[in-house]
């Protein structure tokens, strides 16, 4: 049983609608990964989000939508100076600029159909919220954070931990999972356990 309920789209999409949406999100994913210098990271996150949500009992339709949100959750980076995004050492001021990608991105999902826009906004704006309220931008806690944002938080962190771009040393699967388990105040442990089962 999922915390916060099984929220999905307000209506079903036709296969053609999903295909068109997929093409748009796919194109943005390429741009996001290029500007952040994170090769194929968006798709890797999206694939984990899909697998986790399916394993947790979500429908194929909703899991596909979550996959699409996973492709563009960092879309706000497209309006941030790439020099900052690619810096190895960032200042506090630069980090504050980077943090604005959540609010910037929320205003960039206008191309999403109205019935799904709320879901995409939740993923884009809230994927850096932590269960204990220590995240940003709103400091949401627990069930205030929608499922799509909680699953993105886990998937994004795992991919970052096992990738060389975000950390000086690449962690192996077990080390990355251990870190997610240890930081239980931040990450939904039901989602972490499901991740553990599928990777």
State each model region's role.
Residues 1-11:
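Short, Lys/Arg-enriched N-terminal segments with co-localized hydrophobic residues
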Residues 13-199:
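Histidine- and acidic-residue-rich, metal-dependent catalytic cores
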